[in-house]
């Protein structure tokens, strides 16, 4: 989903499910969190159904598909099980993410350049469901070019190294890497999203980057929601992004 005038906020609700799975209870319900997030201004809801099912479960995805008023961004590993599930659910957006060490780059994104044929086949198969397929990659020209070559219309740039940077120099270097990656991706004709490790104290610099379509944020929202409530946590983040991206 793109919007010409403003940056979008995708709310990842995985860690609401993490809290539920810690005790194997029926609460807290990630579906309720998703609906609250939408009410508070989320432009979409992101869920990652992992092979180990450590947080989100199939049932969550099925229910969310039926009740969301915005759209679902379904994160998944490149496996036959997940491909078949995505074909059944048919989410609006699918983001392919690395789940095994072989699929990872050194920074942590999907190594598209190292497995182009496999990723191309997955992108083509998933595109037939009508989904917009994106690839979660590092802000690296080689990976961005490979993403275009395999036919993905969108990418999500991994902001984890920026989030983990310790010194002002490191922060500036990692931010420049993202800025350059966004410009390169847009120049390649791709929709460029970003996310991973973003929180209330580091999001503004990324939200100020021209060319980013959407930021996906989860853990920081769930953590802040413990103290202010989920709607307030989402609304606060949305306000930061809107102000910074003007």
Swiss-Prot record:
Active-site residues per Swiss-Prot or TrEMBL entry: 48, 75, 196
Location in or out of the cell: Cytoplasm
InterPro entries listed in its UniProt record: Aldolase_TIM, PyrdxlP_synth_PdxJ, Pyridoxine-5'_phos_synth
One of the record's GO cellular component terms: cytosol
EC nos: 2.6.99.2
GO biological process: pyridoxine biosynthetic process
Record-marked site positions (Transition state stabilizer): 156
Sequence positions that bind 1-deoxy-D-xylulose 5-phosphate: 14-15, 50, 55, 105
A GO molecular-function annotation: pyridoxine 5'-phosphate synthase activity
Keyword terms, alphabetized: Cytoplasm, Pyridoxine biosynthesis, Transferase
Catalytic activity line of the entry: 3-amino-2-oxopropyl phosphate + 1-deoxy-D-xylulose 5-phosphate = pyridoxine 5'-phosphate + phosphate + 2 H2O + H(+)
Signal sequence, renumbered to the chain: none
Pathway annotation: Cofactor biosynthesis; pyridoxine 5'-phosphate biosynthesis; pyridoxine 5'-phosphate from D-erythrose 4-phosphate: step 5/5
Pfam family, one: PdxJ
Predominant cellular place of this UniProt entry's protein: cytoplasm
Superkingdom of the organism of origin: Bacteria
Binding site for 3-amino-2-oxopropyl phosphate: 12, 23, 197, 218-219
Gene3D superfamilies documented for this protein: Aldolase class I (3.20.20.70)
Task of the protein: Catalyzes the complicated ring closure reaction between the two acyclic compounds 1-deoxy-D-xylulose-5-phosphate (DXP) and 3-amino-2-oxopropyl phosphate (1-amino-acetone-3-phosphate or AAP) to form pyridoxine 5'-phosphate (PNP) and inorganic phosphate.
Family recorded in the similarity comment: Belongs to the PNP synthase family.
Subunit structure, as described in the record: Homooctamer; tetramer of dimers.
Record-given protein name: Pyridoxine 5'-phosphate synthase
Source species: Pseudomonas putida (strain GB-1)
Source taxonomy: Bacteria, Pseudomonadati, Pseudomonadota, Gammaproteobacteria, Pseudomonadales
């Amino acid at each position: 989903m793109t919007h010409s005038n403003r940056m979008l906020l995708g709310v990842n609700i995985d860690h609401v499910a993490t809290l539920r799975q810690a005790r194997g209870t029926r609460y807290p319900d990630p579906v309720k969190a998703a609906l609250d997030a939408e009410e508070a201004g989320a432009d979409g809801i992101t869920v990652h159904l992992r092979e180990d099912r450590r947080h989100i479960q199939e049932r969550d995805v099925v229910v969310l598909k039926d009740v969301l008023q915005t759209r679902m961004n379904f994160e998944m590993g490149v496996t036959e099980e997940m491909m078949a599930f995505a074909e059944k659910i048919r989410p609006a957006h699918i983001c392919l993410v690395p789940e095994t060490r072989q699929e990872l780059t050194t920074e942590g994104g999907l190594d598209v350049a190292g497995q182009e044929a496999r990723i191309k086949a997955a992108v083509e198969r998933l595109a037939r469901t009508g989904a917009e397929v994106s690839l979660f990659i590092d802000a690296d020209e080689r990976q961005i070019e490979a993403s275009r070559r395999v036919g993905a219309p969108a990418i999500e740039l991994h902001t984890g190294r920026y989030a983990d940077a310790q010194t002002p120099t490191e922060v500036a270097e990692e931010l420049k890497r993202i800025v350059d990656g966004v410009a390169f991706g847009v120049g390649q004709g791709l929709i460029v999203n970003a996310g991973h490790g973003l929180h209330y104290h580091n999001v503004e610099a990324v939200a100020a980057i021209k060319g980013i379509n959407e930021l996906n944020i989860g853990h920081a929202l769930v953590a802040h929601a413990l103290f202010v409530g989920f709607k307030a946590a989402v609304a606060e983040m949305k306000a930061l992004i809107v102000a910074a991206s003007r």
